[in-house]
Swiss-Prot record:
Domain of life: Eukaryota
Protein name listed in UniProt: Ubiquitin-related modifier 1
Keywords, in A-Z order: Cytoplasm, Isopeptide bond, tRNA processing, Ubl conjugation pathway
Family: Belongs to the URM1 family.
Protein's job: Acts as a sulfur carrier required for 2-thiolation of mcm(5)S(2)U at tRNA wobble positions of cytosolic tRNA(Lys), tRNA(Glu) and tRNA(Gln). Serves as sulfur donor in tRNA 2-thiolation reaction by being thiocarboxylated (-COSH) at its C-terminus by MOCS3. The sulfur is then transferred to tRNA to form 2-thiolation of mcm(5)S(2)U. Also acts as a ubiquitin-like protein (UBL) that is covalently conjugated via an isopeptide bond to lysine residues of target proteins such as MOCS3, ATPBD3, CTU2, USP15 and CAS.
PTM section of the record: C-terminal thiocarboxylation occurs in 2 steps, it is first acyl-adenylated (-COAMP) via the hesA/moeB/thiF part of MOCS3, then thiocarboxylated (-COSH) via the rhodanese domain of MOCS3.
Pathway(s) per entry: tRNA modification; 5-methoxycarbonylmethyl-2-thiouridine-tRNA biosynthesis
HAMAP family per the UniProt record, alphabetical: Urm1 (MF_03048)
Chief localisation class: cytoplasm
PANTHER family named in the record: RURM1 PROTEIN
Organism, scientific name: Homo sapiens (Human)
SUPFAM superfamilies: MoaD/ThiS
């Protein structure tokens, strides 16, 4: 069984507006059978942090196109995207690159 993890989740570029305007969240993910990965984190975020308009953040089982994801300041595409296994004290940053005009 995977132990609970403490992770910093941050939203920027306007994405924080979907989370009551709160940019930084220090969360404890509960222990579970399988290791925590980004796919599971997104499900947890949708259930526990996302306050409105989930379609602006989630598309299918991933983030919407136009949302940049950084894990410990590295592009998630270099780390396996949804399959990246979270480690205790990881930092995950979601930045919306879509802006109205």
């Amino acid at each position: 069984m995977a132990a609970p993890l403490s992770v910093e989740v941050e939203f920027g570029g306007g994405a924080e507006l979907l989370f009551d305007g709160i940019k930084k969240h220090r969360v404890t993910l509960p222990g579970q059978e399988e290791p925590w990965d980004i796919r599971n984190l997104l499900i947890w975020i949708k259930k526990n942090l996302l306050k409105e308009r989930p379609e602006l953040f989630i598309q299918g089982d991933s983030v919407r196109p136009g949302i940049l994801v950084l894990i410990n300041d590295a592009d998630w595409e270099l780390l396996g995207e949804l399959d990246y296994q979270l480690q205790d004290q990881d930092s995950v940053l979601f930045i919306s690159t879509l802006h109205g005009g």
